[in-house]
Design a protein with these regions (language model features):
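Active-site loop signature of alpha/beta-hydrolase-fold enzymes
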Residues: 40-41, 67-72, 136
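Short beta-strand element of the alpha/beta-hydrolase
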Residues: 28-37
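Catalytic nucleophile-loop/oxyanion-hole region of alpha/beta-hydrolase
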Residues: 69-100
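Primarily recognizes the serine-hydrolase "nucleophile elbow" in alpha/beta-hydrolase
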Residues: 91-136
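N-terminal cap/lid segment of alpha/beta-hydrolase-fold proteins
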Residues: 1-27
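The serine-hydrolase catalytic nucleophile loop
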Residues: 38-51, 66
Length: 136
């Protein structure tokens, strides 16, 4: 697994920080986005482990910090669920502009709920995995 630090801008102009993990010995067959849990970061052990497993299966995976968390700009106190959805859309736009649109969204806890909602608006998404997501 080789991680590459990347940055992209959300619709509020905040620079979001991410890590793009690519398979070691081949080009990615597909791309995925990993959305972390509430107040966590892209560096959460679960995020790293899931990213590793997906990259070993041929996925390029972008894990990023939501606005105001980790290394991303912005004030966390000014964020809400809608801003999380917008951050996921910004991550997808980054992949589309630089690689190809994501076909898989993965989220943990609140990130899982966010990918369920965001993925329903993205034509490129073929699968969504929500881990411990609070959603009815």
């Amino acid at each position: 697994m080789k991680g590459k630090a990347v940055h992209f801008t959300n619709d509020n102009g905040d620079k979001l920080s991410g890590i793009l993990e690519l398979p070691v010995e081949r080009k990615p067959a597909h791309f995925a986005i990993f959305a972390h849990c509430f107040t966590c970061s892209k560096d959460l052990r679960a995020a790293r482990n899931i990213t590793l497993a997906l990259s070993q299966k041929g996925f390029g995976v972008l894990r990023f910090d939501f606005t105001g968390l980790g290394e991303s700009e912005g004030d966390f106190e000014d964020t809400n669920f809608t801003s999380n959805l917008n951050d996921i859309a910004a991550a997808a736009a980054f992949l589309e502009e630089n690689y190809t649109s994501p076909s898989l969204l993965v989220g943990h806890s609140l990130g899982g709920t966010a990918v369920l909602m965001a993925g329903s608006q993205m034509e490129s998404v073929k699968a969504i995995a929500a881990i411990g997501a609070p959603c009815e």
